[in-house]
Each structure stands twice: as C-alpha cells, then as structure tokens.
Amino acid sequence: MIYSIKIDPKDNVAVVTDEVKAGDTVFYKNPDGSKTEIKAITPVTVYHKIAICDISRGDKVVKYGEHIGEASCDIKAGEHVHTHNVESVREDLKI
C-alpha cells in the first residue's frame, strides 16, 4: 500500500511517500478522514506529485492549497506531475 499527502481540499495533486510504479494503487486521506485511492498510470518518484484528478492544459496545479504552476499539457489522474508537464508561475518576491 502506497500513501500520499493531500493537505488542502483545493489540492489537485498529492505527494507520494514512496516510489510508485505504473499500476500501483496510491491512497490519500480526505479532510473528513475518509481515504481515496488513485491508480498510478505512470511511475512517480518518491516525494513527487501525482495528479488526483484530470488537469487540463492551462489549469492551475494546486499543492498544499497553493497555486504552484500551470499544466503545460493535459494531465490525467494518476500521472506523475513535475517540470515535464507543469510550467512555473513564480512571481517576483517583494521584500
């Protein structure tokens, strides 16, 4: 059993806590305490993100409740989410 971390209800990705192979089942806990499972369709490196729903090209990628990038292509639920399919939207820091 492989677990992942989903912090915020707005998240559309979860962070896996172990190496994931295509076909593995990954679980995450919902805010109400229930568990949801997702079938990995690509390998996912430990501590990387897995899509927990389909994300369309141009949609926001949300991790820990924060907008961390935009999908550079359509991403299917169960796919590895990383720099190969997400464009950064970093903003200049004002200090």
Where do the language-model regions lie?
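N-terminal small-residue-enriched
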Residues: M1-I95
